[in-house]
Amino acid sequence: MSGDPGLEALKARVAEVPLGPEIEETGRIATLADGLVEVEGLPGARLGEVVRFAGGAEGLVLTLDPETVQVALLDPGAALGSGTEVRRTGQLLSVPVGQGLLGRVVDPLGRPLDGLPAILPEARLEIERPAPGIVDRDMVAEPVETGLLVVDALFAVGRGQRELIIGERATGKTSLAVDAIVNQAASDIVCFYVAIGQRTTAVRRVIETVREKGAFARTVFVVAPATASPGLRWIAPFAATSMAEWVRDRGGHALIVYDDLTKHAAVHRELALLARQPPGREAYPGDIFYLHARLLERSAKLSAVNGGGSLTALPIAEIEAGNLSAYIPTNLISIADGQIVTSAALFAANQRPAVDIGLSVSRVGGKAQRGALKAVAGRVRLDYAQYLEMKMFSRFGGFGDAALRARLARGERIGALLAQPRTTPLSTPVQVALLAALAEGALDDVPLEDLTRLKAALGPVLAADASLGPFCAAPDRLEPETRAALLACVRRAREAP
């Protein structure tokens, strides 16, 4: 009997059963206000631990005091009051991850908001995870193609980059990010859209837009609207990042949009003030920079040894009266690898996307830009900036010099090329063809109103040219014969009815 494998396995399982007394730590609610609970009697509680209230509601331990702990409610509808019993779970907050999240709308805890069955997770990950170390990362060298000419040509975004989208209210910030998501419908990038404190109607419009454009099945929506508890809004970006890291850590590629971190900073301030933490500049607590730094540092391009996956972040921030030097905007600008600034003046002038060329920058994306696009986009930004300056001075009097008039006309065409309606992405070959034609002067005699039609007609013309098949599949180099073929396609597109 002693050699029976089944008996030995049973003995091993019995040995694992704890035979001592089970110790359970319990406490009671001392005070309750605005989604934050002060609990007495949990001396062993840890930061980030989940506690459970009588009745099943859960909360997240945010701060530890000598006699009490501050707990953020994760179930705002729970019926709680002073004296309600609270128990430790001993577990840090985690969220479900896996392929089952694709095409779903969930809250930050992974609970469905779309009326469909519960998510069947492949694993669970803690919401607070360390960022990849220096040796675990690789250089940003592959592009995230947004389909927006102004971004891909002038401020390229690379896989693993953090590119901030910042501007005043209602200047097209979310539209830029949604366009980037829509353009991944046929790519290998999985998208995550995180709504933090947004209006439910605005989130619904985003979801419907992504659905209509065919990218819904490759997108995960993590929604903590303005009506959600402060605790849920606070954990939303961290929870969604863990969901996206599951894709990255398996060698995949993910794109995450945080909409927006200004509202996240506001809810962090709200919880800190309720917890009686000392206020600092603009009443934010002292750890506000660390809050967003530890979040955005989790976006990275991993080395080949670690699978070669990537997580690209497009955080969104809102400013007031064009003030980029406010506290939260300067924090985010210093953390990110560049920023795309939207302008209220350009938006009012009907320029879409309303990107401010002079204030926007991509610090590392240039290394990831397609070689062919880099070859034709070199002078576009400088020429357009000079045009904007000359345009301002031209209001005071006409330019008699023919060369200056030609530069003004060229600038107008650059502006018309960069203008792009929502959810109408341009492929990289089309972008290269347009900019090559611009550089060669092939668009100088094209009326501005015809450029929109030309951009729409050029894609099918390129696809029909068999000689451009290899280039369209991998537009990494622009050979002289390829440039000539692209210019010929532009001429045919101009002549198309």
From Swiss-Prot:
Q: Which GO terms describe its cellular component?
A: plasma membrane; proton-transporting ATP synthase complex
Top class in the EC scheme:
translocase
Binding residues annotated for ATP, in chain numbering: 167-174
How does this protein sit in the membrane?
Peripheral membrane protein
Q: What is this protein's gene name?
A: atpA2
SUPFAM superfamilies, alphabetized: C-terminal domain of alpha and beta subunits of F1 ATP synthase, N-terminal domain of alpha and beta subunits of F1 ATP synthase, P-loop containing nucleoside triphosphate hydrolases
Alphabetical list of Pfam families matching this protein: ATP-synt_ab, ATP-synt_ab_C
Q: Which reaction does it catalyse?
A: ATP + H2O + 4 H(+)(in) = ADP + phosphate + 5 H(+)(out)
Oligomeric form and interacting partners: F-type ATPases have 2 components, CF(1) - the catalytic core - and CF(0) - the membrane proton channel. CF(1) has five subunits: alpha(3), beta(3), gamma(1), delta(1), epsilon(1). CF(0) has four main subunits: a(1), b(1), b'(1) and c(9-12).
Does the record carry Membrane as a key word? yes
According to its UniProt record, where is this protein located? Cell inner membrane
Per its record, what are the GO molecular function terms? ADP binding; ATP binding; proton-transporting ATP synthase activity, rotational mechanism
Q: InterPro entries this protein is in?
A: ATP_synth_asu-like_sf, ATP_synth_asu_C, ATP_synth_asu_C_sf, ATP_synth_F1_a_nt-bd_dom, ATP_synth_F1_asu, ATPase_a/bsu_AS, ATPase_F1/V1/A1_a/bsu_N_sf, ATPase_F1/V1/A1_a/bsu_nucl-bd
What this protein is called in its record is ATP synthase subunit alpha 2
Top-level division of the source organism's lineage: Bacteria
Oxidoreductase as a keyword of this entry, yes or no, is no
Residue ranges that the Swiss-Prot or TrEMBL entry lists as coiled coil = none
Site description Required for activity, residues in chain: 360
Indicate where this protein is primarily found.
membrane
Report the sequence similarity comment from the record: Belongs to the ATPase alpha/beta chains family.
Give the organism, scientific name. Answer: Cereibacter sphaeroides (strain ATCC 17029 / ATH 2.4.9)
Q: What does this protein do?
A: Produces ATP from ADP in the presence of a proton gradient across the membrane. The alpha chain is a regulatory subunit.
Instruction: Provide this UniProt record's keywords sorted from A to Z.
Output: ATP synthesis, ATP-binding, Cell inner membrane, Cell membrane, CF(1), Hydrogen ion transport, Ion transport, Membrane, Nucleotide-binding, Plasmid, Translocase, Transport
Recorded E.C. number(s)? 7.1.2.2
